[in-house]
Amino acid sequence: MLKLHRLQPARLLASPRRRSAAITATFTLRLYSTPATNETWQSGNLKLSHVVGVSTPPLYENTTGRLLRDLAQTHADHPAIISVHQDVRLTYAELDRRSDILAVNVARQLGIRRGDRVAVCSGNSWEYPVLQLGLAKLGAVLVPLNPAFTDTQFHAALNNSQSRALIIQSHLSRGRRKTSRDITGLIRAATDGNLLPSVEKVVILDSMAAPPEDARMYIALDGERIRPFDSLLKWYSAESAADMPEIAYLHDVAEDRKYANEVINMQFTSGTTAMPKISCLTHRNLTNNGSLIGQRMGITPTDKICAPVPMFHCFGLVLTNLAILSQGGAVVYASETFDARSTLQAVRTEQCTGLQGVPTMFSAELELKDELKKGGHELLRKGIAAGTSIPVEMMNRLIETLNLDQLTICYGMTETSPVSFMTAPGDTLERRCETVGTVMPHTEAKVIAPNMEPGPVDLTPLPVGKKGEIIISGYLLQKGYHNSPSKTFEAMVADPANPEKVWMRTGDEGVMDEFGYLKVTGRLKDLIIRGGENIHPLEIENVLFKHPAVSQASVVGVPDPKYGEAVAAFIQLHEEYHPPRTPSGTISHKPGPSVEEIQTFVETNLGHYMVPKYVWFVPDFPKTASGKIRKVDLKGTALSLI
């Protein structure tokens, strides 16, 4: 049994480049596994759940800003960003130049320096990648904020991240319009030294959903501390690139390389706690993860990928912006926030070749039969589905209806930058639906015996075919959680066989096959234990998706006096099974399935012990802003109903 001894957590943050040096290990003698060679698992001869990705292409060892500079020289006049709802198109050269200007003005007008945090709260727009890349060039840290945060969450996020500046859209949308009064309150708080002591400057970004007068109204509150976003793009004609000392290092490859391991992004993890942890990610983490994703997707400069996913999340910043831009493709924003109809219209007008999304987004798009009949998606082939698995039925519909025959599946977490496993466009339909693919290049992964209790962790890999906790190692690991050394040490464990190596505990349960394909069976914390039987919600959800009337489904565990826990299922039906939506009842519909029919369907496909004791039909699901179903909310609802 491997026994890990952790030293004082403060050492990790004191020397982030040598984080593993802050962790030592003692262990009793035990045969330690050697990771399988690529030839071993690719040929189907893998015995233990331990794989290492290929070491080609080599990792990019420069900054994100330098990557954009190189891309702008290669693809200068090629479209990089297309914001349909703003009617704005930026070439690579324009994106490079605007991000240069923004970097300089953020330094000169806002007083931001390398390492300072800048919070950004905005919907999808051309300004977001300019901010993402401009702040990276300056060496400042982008802190993306979820527009759906409550005022209390905004205050906590700004204080916990110690952001020195806030760039916020004049009109925030959470699926419905948020009033100007709410935003005014946020801005007043941001300029209140007592409430948010770290925030020194506020920049107002005009929203397409509100007139420019709104921004001017906010600026009038405090002309010294509040300014318009346009001012950050002001170019002084007398200056040239050589007159910008703030980003002069970009011209020297060797000088630029010194900063590749610096943090440029602080991401709030997608946990459902009151204030999620803050993951610290570097140039090296993000540029490489994005580039490797784009390569596995097969992105080329001829591709236009429609991206309705939010930019405050890794799916938007990395799997979309960096993945597509790193390969010379174009990113298409259909709307500020996800709108299924706008997405399909943008695909049609821009003749997109790819589409990103989570299953709930794809489901909403497939429901718009009137929009789909208009066509215009004949060029669609590529894309990414992430967040949770895609049922076979949905994948078939995406291929038949939207031509997404090269849709890839990604697995990861914020703390791993985020993708560690991914399918390839050429993988079989079965593997793209039932697994998350194989390990990414320069990444190492294991499946180990699950142990959610504090204390020593056994890092010995399980035999293939055995379920356990997924752990990840490699360049993609975060530097740590901001101001949370104890949480960092719980999640990031040193390898006793190699003190320089650190493993990220994902908290996800999975099983690996002899070819190295990984199947994620669920969150360990979501496991339902019914009468001693382990039940994985994902297995039941995948079966429910097979029912012809079911559009979406989510399963949670609830207390049960006899078995300890019972299965509860929430189901959303397809549009045609909903009751009429008009008083006249002119909209045709089919009768939906009964609770008993659903229970019989599960029993027939899985067995009696997995049959939901409770079944509720719902019109919609509570979701995170990134589109994931909030199981914690469903569990609360279930507890109130039983």
What is each stretch, according to the model?
Residues 438-442, 453-494, 535:
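Conserved ATP/PPi-binding loop(s) of AMP-dependent carboxylate-activating enzymes
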Residues 56-60, 77-133, 150-155, 159, ...:
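Conserved AMP-binding/adenylate-forming core of the ANL superfamily
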Residues 221-231, 352-357, 366-432, 444, ...:
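Gly/Ser/Thr-rich phosphate-binding loop
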Residues 89-93, 255-257, 264-288:
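Conserved AMP-binding A3 loop
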Residues 149, 155-156, 355, 474, ...:
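AMP-binding/adenylate-forming catalytic core of the ANL superfamily
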Residues 76-79, 203-204, 209-210, 219-268, ...:
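Conserved pre-ATP/AMP-binding loop-to-beta segment of ANL
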Residues 287-304, 312-354, 364, 368-369, ...:
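Conserved AMP-binding/adenylation subdomain of ANL enzymes
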Residues 2-13, 17-19, 23, 32, ...:
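Structural core segment of the AMP-binding/adenylate-forming
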